[in-house]
Amino acid sequence: MNIVLAASEAFPFCKTGGLADVTGSLAKELSKHKGNRVILFLPHYRNINRVASLKVVPGTFLIPIGDRLETASLSYISWGNVLVFFINNTKYFDRPELYRTAAGDYFDNDERFIFFNRAVLESCKFIGYRPDIIHAHDWQAGLLPAYLKTVYKTDAFFTRTRSLFTIHNMAYQGQYPYSTFIKTGFHTVDYVPERFEYYGGISYLKSGIVYADYVNTVSPNYAKEITLDEKMGFGMEGLLRSRQDTFCGILNGLDTGVWDPEHDPLIPYSYESFSPVKGKAACKQFLQNMLGLEVSPSKPLVGIVSRMDYQKGLDLIPGVVNKYKDKVQFVVVGTGDSGMEKAFMALAKNNVGKVAYVAKVDEELAHRVYAGSDIFLMPSRFEPCGLSQMISMRYGTVPIVSRVGGLLDTVKGYDGITKYATGFFILEFSETGIERSLDYALKYYQDKRCWGMLIKNGMEKDFSWTKSAQEYQDLYKKIISK
């Protein structure tokens, strides 16, 4: 099967969030299936992590943007069994960051991803690769299914090509004004509410949902939420319900080669699920020393690795920290909303030895927080899948999470009885609700037998991509057969 994955980011090449982890890991896992040929398309950003020397594809080709033409070229590497093609255009992609600066989103993100979407299809023709399935990820690739069904509908090269569109987060919809629609090259006859029109403009996310042969999202529970709850569906719940026969949820997996406490080169001490106590204690002490926290083996250490965003519920955490800082240590890592960043900076400054905040995206530090923390706090308002709770369990760090989206699919909440629990649920989304759940967890933290059970259960759960990749493989075959 000839498979194309198209995304705006993929680990280890370029990353701002969980989308990158998913696309990179999925491509790698799919390439292990017999008979699959997998190509991953990415924009060629300035700061691409070159895991190997890039090879240049000779020649260039043109991409229409409105009434003008922009030039594209290709570079590629072989990454295991995956061919990774980078779409080059210095005007659009030679920038310090992927999507935005501290001042806001790049003003021409609409054009950047029109260019990327059309360039993926033109790249396939340029290198002579006829895909059976094009798997487009999130709004940045949402125009791909639409181009296949409209502009490229009569193109013989794509006669047998089908599309799958994966929604990673309904909150990010790629909304732009009508002037952007004109730049796309779609026909104005299709500018109606049933197709492209969206509140007088265009949504790249909606375009993917409308035109893809099949649509999925990244956990079964989130698939239910975004069709039934207008707060979760962000205005598109009706559209998703109309696709109920061609819509499903497939749980994301983890790259267990990257996230492996037994062989992780980024943590100071390794450990296994059957004997994690000494290794975790050593990682905790290392983290406390590293971040200037009081070195205390007995004091619970709560870790947070997250984007500073309203979705993540971190606006409620400073109040919680102020109440618990004398009996619990906190480590927070992440960037985003400037108001939240300032709040955590102030907390750390005023509570030296008790609270640490690191305002950057740091892969090495993230690994050390997952390994060195006792508890991982994830109070999301909504969470399509979430990888952090899976990583924390794999590292023997007990999660406290909201009962939403993929968190409900992956964490088994402890009720004081069940022997299969892996963490705790926040039953009421509020500062008080978080505090109640933290109190409940701290009660069992003192019970070493019970806490050891939670650690062991979490570390032994299988979060690998094997099962999820097989579900995608089966879905591809189903789509192609229609």
From Swiss-Prot:
A GO molecular-function descriptor: alpha-1,4-glucan glucosyltransferase (ADP-glucose donor) activity
Record carries keyword DNA-binding: no
Annotated ADP-alpha-D-glucose binding sites: K15
One record GO biological process: glycogen biosynthetic process
Function, in words: Synthesizes alpha-1,4-glucan chains using ADP-glucose.
Protein family membership: Belongs to the glycosyltransferase 1 family. Bacterial/plant glycogen synthase subfamily.
Protein name per UniProt: Glycogen synthase
Lineage: Bacteria, Pseudomonadati, Elusimicrobiota, Elusimicrobia, Elusimicrobiales
Designated gene of the protein: glgA
